[in-house]
Amino acid sequence: MDVRRGGGGGRIVGAARRALTWGALPLPMRITNGLAMVSLVLSSCDLLRLCSDRERPLGGREFATVVCQLASVVYLLSLFAHPDAPATTTGDDDDGQGGSRRARPAAAEPAPMHGHGGGMMEADDEEIVAAVASGALPSHRLESRLGDCRRAARLRREALRRVTGRGVEGLPFDGMDYQAILGQCCEMPVGYVQLPVGVAGPLLLDGREYHVPMATTEGCLVASVNRGCRAISASGGAFSVLLRDAMSRAPAVKLPSAMRAAELKAFAEAPANFELLAAVFNRSSRFGRLQDIRCALAGRNLYMRFSCITGDAMGMNMVSKGVENVLGYLQNVFPDMDVISVSGNYCSDKKPTAVNWIEGRGKSVVCEAIIKGDVVQKVLKTTVEKLVELNIIKNLAGSAVAGALGGFNAHASNIVTALFIATGQDPAQNVESSQCITMLEEVDDGDDLHISVTMPSIEVGTIGGGTCLASQAACLNLLGVKGSNHGSPGANAKRLATIVAGSVLAGELSLLAALASGHLVKSHMMYNRSSKDVAKAAS
């Protein structure tokens, strides 16, 4: 670092040099300070004794005592008053290697960057990038040291280029609010990824029209859902039912024996104890309200599945805090209970599981529509009979042959993922949110088609997570579900879940029609980029 500059880097080095003068003492600082204190105390006591003996004349000893006391006072005053005096630390070091009690110059440490005027804030970009690239400055501390999230991301990006030797020019940087994502969406950002957003619709659902935003790179997907929306709207619309609303978290605990674990299971599931446990759970949030507790036993390990409503939030953090409250209470009642993990996979999050398929997680929704026979022929280019037969052979029997778990559908995850990314949901939760069974039946003497999708685990929220980002907030606003519903907490998240199910209904209808009519490959060759890529490669 060039100390000739007038920036913070020069001041840090200068302070370190001044601090070295304190380290030049012949004895360690701790011993020197102790000797000074002892000298001050002894000389003071000696002077008090001499003052009480007024008849004794002053001699060499008395003068030596006075000089010793004055020297001790001057030393200690200079030690405590000097701004560059070293501080002795006893806490853990930043790198986790605690226990060190060595005296070190406080001024030689980088100044905190939470406010203006810190040394790192005034250092130039080149110094900071070099420090990050060399490992002297951890990349994850740039935001806190600089106090400027945008600058931190820009310098991290440059340091990444130097370390890897590869540029990221194609990765956009401008246009992102890096302050908004701090502590909420992403750590150590260097830019953001662009995804095209298409709009399908209008989807006529429960008497209201929705234009559905979908972020995807799969050609033909938005067009297919749009055709399904057109068929549904032309037939009078779709209707949805919310069956259940409860996010779950299942901690894993261990007890000394299976018998003792069974006792805890009985206690947690006893109706007489529910109000007590609910009161403990509900302390964590204004909106989180415990709905039920269901337990599973494996040897002496117990898995307690807590389910609660979470307002307009998806609710994972909310339910986790409530679970911690209950675990603290249960440890008083069962002191031999050992908490292994706040999540024991019986929840079950981001995994296709039978418990979610049967019990549900998040919002459980059924959406249905009756498609007129003439619409099936004119819009979908097929027949009711072919669609019903295809659904049985493909979605039901075919999925059973494959051993599917909640995958009795054509492509529900396509629509769920595209909607999740567009509206700021957790894309990884499309695993359980896409669990869906699609049913098709002939009605009205075979003239019309009844289609439904049953989705037991749609995990969505309209506040928190990625919903704070400008693009995702705009998509939520397009659907009329942005933010929390103050008049009816939870209403926006519930409506978003029904929109997801309605969009899946449209996507299922259109894809099955394309398969039944033999148009799938042709439509993908028309709308998918693969044909263009092949043409480029051939030329």
Swiss-Prot record:
Q: Which GO terms describe its molecular function?
A: hydroxymethylglutaryl-CoA reductase (NADPH) activity
Q: Where is this region: Disordered?
A: 87-116
Location (main, coarse): endoplasmic reticulum
Q: Membrane-spanning residues where?
A: 63-83, 496-516
Assigned keywords, A-Z: Endoplasmic reticulum, Glycoprotein, Isoprene biosynthesis, Membrane, NADP, Oxidoreductase, Transmembrane, Transmembrane helix
Q: Which InterPro entries match?
A: HMG_CoA_Rdtase (IPR002202), HMG_CoA_Rdtase_cat_sf (IPR023074), HMG_CoA_Rdtase_CS (IPR023076), HMG_CoA_Rdtase_eu_arc (IPR004554), HMG_CoA_Rdtase_N (IPR023282), HMG_CoA_Rdtase_NAD(P)-bd_sf (IPR009023), HMG_CoA_Rdtase_sub-bd_dom_sf (IPR009029)
This chain belongs to the protein called: 3-hydroxy-3-methylglutaryl-coenzyme A reductase 1
What does this protein's UniProt record list under function? Catalyzes the synthesis of mevalonate. The specific precursor of all isoprenoid compounds present in plants.
User: What's a BP term from Gene Ontology annotated to this protein?
Assistant: sterol biosynthetic process
The protein's organism comes out as Oryza sativa subsp. indica (Rice)
Enzyme class at the top of the EC tree: oxidoreductase
The segments labelled Linker in the record are 84-124
The record ties this protein, via PROSITE patterns, to: HMG_COA_REDUCTASE_1 (PS00066), HMG_COA_REDUCTASE_2 (PS00318), HMG_COA_REDUCTASE_3 (PS01192), HMG_COA_REDUCTASE_4 (PS50065)
Q: Where is the active site?
A: 218, 350, 426, 524
Q: Where is there biased composition of kind Low complexity?
A: 105-114
Per the UniProt record, which EC number(s) apply here? 1.1.1.34
Q: Which GO terms describe its cellular component?
A: endoplasmic reticulum membrane; peroxisomal membrane
**Positions annotated as glycosylated:** 282, 528
Q: Which superkingdom, per the lineage?
A: Eukaryota
Stretches for region Catalytic? 125-539
One Pfam family of this chain: HMG-CoA_red
